[in-house]
């Protein structure tokens, strides 16, 4: 690997070229200044980074010893006393409110869906950024949100019977969201602008208007024959498209051809769990796509339906307000960027002692440099109109680590000439030590925090690893009913509201991981806004459009105001360990659990290691497509490692299960021309060996993380490919 030496750093030549030739021009940042500042950041803060990781290991060793002696805690007072004694559970300070300034409305006041997308994939990133608006008709027609029964089947050509069901669903939605003063939306035969009001004519000739006239926000076209009508509910916009020249509009009494919903309000461009970036070559792909998003020039050639077109970022949408002034609505989701956590290093840059630099330090400096194209002195202000950069910081353990992230951001701001606290922080509440000390974690970032989010997948992985020695864990499918998880979800909202996040920041909930099951999502995911979350994760732009309907039905600000008076969730419940009281499962139940875990692990790992794909829709054992990333992998691997450690299963049984499941995963991937089967070459398959490592060496992995094994094995495969 060719390297360029700058200020005691040895930088991969390709990364250096990208930074100097592509990222820096237009920012006002001099290359020598940048590399000197990066070197200072690395050499000042890397030792502290390593010390924090050593502290994680020290606490885990003490927990392991305690559990080996006591088993799962029965006397919770004694358990809490122990956690306080070792510095795991910290004293809680006085009440306070966060004071984060210059926060965009998309985060502070608009409640709605949030997408998370691998920024390594330009097409996915563009789709996610453009998912601010989505067709409700398309989202309903193309998914199981509308049942196939009674002639409503999806086919290759348009099915009018299904279309009628879609239109009926959408009209019912309008009745609930923007009701009329008289009549129903299904009876509307015409729309026009009368002065500053929306006038609707029903099919029986009756004139009506909106029950709440203030919900009329704007229009395009002429007042007599508008082409679009903009309505508003709970800070979210609905665009009714009027076009009688289209087949749908022609058949509609009012000429309505579509209903467009404001959908993904925010999108996290992910450099972490959904990507496979193990070296400088990969990191340049990550950073180049982020650069394209910040400069607004990211584009991708897309082939669809026999034609090729260029996908790029959508422009803002411009309408006329009822009073005749211009209404401009953002055309794109507000973009946050998720940097990696504190754990991993990356060979892209070496320090003065030849050590790989902490990847989180590199991400902070480079993603912020690139953000100057949006928020710098000459920035476009096309993403953040408030002039802020939003960084989601994952996998932090406790307030010391949050404070360290703030210190990193302060260094970066000083280096890049940004005012203090320009870089805002999203705190992923996905590690047990952060959960139990959440108030102090928020306090450590009180001037930066814009987001707390329950990541129940990683949080479950940490729950298993933290209490690995306590006994065999309950089955994975039972985990959602365990006492700790409900308390954890409520605690996050309770603490967030106590710390004044309402109206200032996002309180988020986790991912709907079944992108094909939209009817179930429509039924179940409304629980998130009802629980006081003003955002929640969805797996696709289509899911964002459907989930947006929940925020029309639920006024989250009102819910949060009501929750402020409830008692806080119980810490004792959060600290309860999900060990099986009577691990008397049948052999069939044990094998089914193993099959399910092994199949999920292999289905994800084979694409990660062999193809560098960090986020996949992996068919489960029942062929239901599940969105898998490193968080779901962490749970499955740790669960198998736990059962192995406690003798529920044997090593022989695990290896035999993995071999059988490899054949199933091979069959599930038979249609992928780039797929390399594992069966028949298990010893040679680096992906299969990685999957075995994750389970058989699961107890040894730091906090149960999968990154060390995945990175090592992916680098091994890339080296093998280069050698051949």
Swiss-Prot record:
Top-rank lineage group of the source organism: Bacteria
Provenance organism: Sinorhizobium fredii (strain NBRC 101917 / NGR234)
Enzyme Commission numbers on file: 2.3.3.9
Cellular component annotations (GO), alphabetically ordered: cytosol
Location(s) in or outside the cell: Cytoplasm
Protein name per UniProt: Malate synthase G
One BP term from GO: glyoxylate catabolic process
Annotated glyoxylate binding sites: 338, 430, 455-458
Gene3D superfamilies found in the cross-reference section: Malate synthase, domain 3, Malate synthase, domain III
Entry GO MF terms: magnesium ion binding; malate synthase activity
């Amino acid at each position: 690997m060719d390297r360029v030496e700058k200020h005691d750093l040895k930088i991969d030549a390709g990364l250096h070229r990208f930074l100097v030739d592509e990222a820096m021009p237009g920012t006002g940042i001099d290359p020598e200044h940048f590399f000197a500042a990066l070197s200072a950041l690395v050499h000042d803060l890397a030792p502290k980074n390593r010390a924090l990781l050593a502290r994680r290991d020290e606490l885990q060793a003490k927990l392991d010893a305690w559990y080996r002696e006591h088993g799962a805690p029965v006397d919770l007072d004694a358990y809490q006393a122990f956690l306080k004694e070792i510095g795991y559970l910290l004293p809680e300070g006085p009440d306070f409110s966060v004071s984060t300034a210059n926060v965009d409305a998309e985060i502070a006041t608009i409640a709605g869906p949030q997408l998370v997308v691998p920024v390594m994939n330009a097409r996915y990133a563009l789709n996610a950024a453009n998912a601010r608006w989505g067709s409700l008709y398309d989202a309903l027609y193309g998914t199981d949100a509308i049942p196939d029964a009674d002639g409503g089947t999806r086919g290759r050509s348009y099915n009018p019977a299904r279309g009628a069901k879609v239109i009926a669903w959408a009209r019912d939605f309008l009745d609930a969201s923007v009701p009329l003063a008289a009549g129903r939306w299904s009876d509307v035969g015409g729309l026009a602008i009368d002065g500053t009001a929306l006038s609707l004519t029903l099919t029986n000739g009756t004139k009506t208007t909106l029950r709440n006239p203030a919900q009329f926000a704007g229009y395009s076209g002429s007042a007599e024959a508008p082409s679009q009508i903009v309505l508003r509910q709970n800070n979210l916009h609905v665009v009714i498209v009027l076009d009688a020249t289209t087949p749908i509009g022609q058949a509609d009494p009012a000429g309505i051809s579509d209903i467009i919903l404001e959908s993904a309000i925010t999108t996290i461009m992910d450099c972490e769990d959904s990507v496979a970036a193990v070296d400088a070559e990969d990191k340049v792909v990550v950073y180049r796509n982020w650069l394209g998003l910040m400069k607004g020039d990211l584009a991708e050639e897309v082939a669809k339906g026999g034609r090729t077109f260029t996908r790029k970022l959508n422009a803002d949408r411009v309408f006329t307000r009822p009073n005749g002034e211009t209404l401009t609505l953002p055309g794109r989701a507000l973009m946050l960027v998720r940097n990696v956590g504190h754990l991993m290093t990356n060979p892209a840059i070496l320090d003065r002692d030849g050590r790989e630099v902490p990847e989180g330090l590199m991400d902070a400096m480079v993603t912020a440099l690139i953000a100057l194209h949006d928020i710098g002195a000459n920035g476009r202000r096309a993403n953040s109109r408030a002039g802020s950069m939003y960084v989601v910081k994952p996998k932090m353990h406790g307030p010391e680590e949050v404070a360290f992230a703030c210190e990193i951001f302060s260094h970066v701001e000083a280096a890049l000439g940004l005012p203090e606290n320009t870089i805002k922080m999203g705190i992923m509440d996905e590690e047990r030590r952060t959960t139990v000390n959440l108030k102090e974690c928020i306090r450590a970032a009180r001037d930066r925090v814009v987001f707390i989010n329950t990541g129940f997948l990683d949080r479950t992985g940490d729950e298993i690893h933290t209490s690995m020695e306590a006994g065999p864990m309950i089955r994975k499918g039972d985990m959602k009913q365990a006492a700790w998880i409900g308390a954890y979800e409520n605690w996050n909202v309770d603490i967030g509201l106590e710390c004044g996040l309402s109206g200032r920041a996002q309180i988020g909930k986790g991912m709907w991981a079944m992108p094909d099951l939209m009817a179930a999502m429509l039924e179940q995911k409304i629980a998130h806004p009802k629980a006081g979350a003003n955002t929640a994760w969805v797996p696709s732009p289509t899911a964002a459009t459907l989930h947006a309907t929940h925020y029309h039905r639920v006024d989250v600000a009102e819910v949060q105001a009501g929750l402020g008076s409830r008692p806080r969730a119980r810490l004792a419940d959060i600290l309860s360990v999900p060990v099986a009281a009577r691990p008397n499962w049948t052999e069939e139940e044990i094998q089914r659990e193993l099959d399910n875990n092994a199949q999920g692990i292999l289905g994800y790992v084979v694409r990660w290691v062999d193809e560098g794909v960090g986020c996949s829709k992996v068919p489960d054992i029942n062929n239901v497509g599940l969105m898998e990333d490193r968080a779901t992998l962490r749970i499955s691997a740790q669960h198998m490692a736990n059962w192995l450690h406690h003798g529920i299963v044997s090593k022989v049984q695990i290896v035999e299960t993995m071999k059988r499941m490899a054949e199933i995963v091979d069959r599930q991937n038979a249609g992928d021309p780039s797929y390399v089967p594992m069966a028949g070459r298990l010893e040679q398959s680096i992906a299969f060996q990685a999957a075995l490592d994750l389970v058989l060496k699961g107890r040894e992995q730091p906090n149960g993380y999968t990154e060390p094994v995945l990175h090592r094995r992916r680098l091994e495969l890339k080296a093998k490919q280069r050698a051949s």
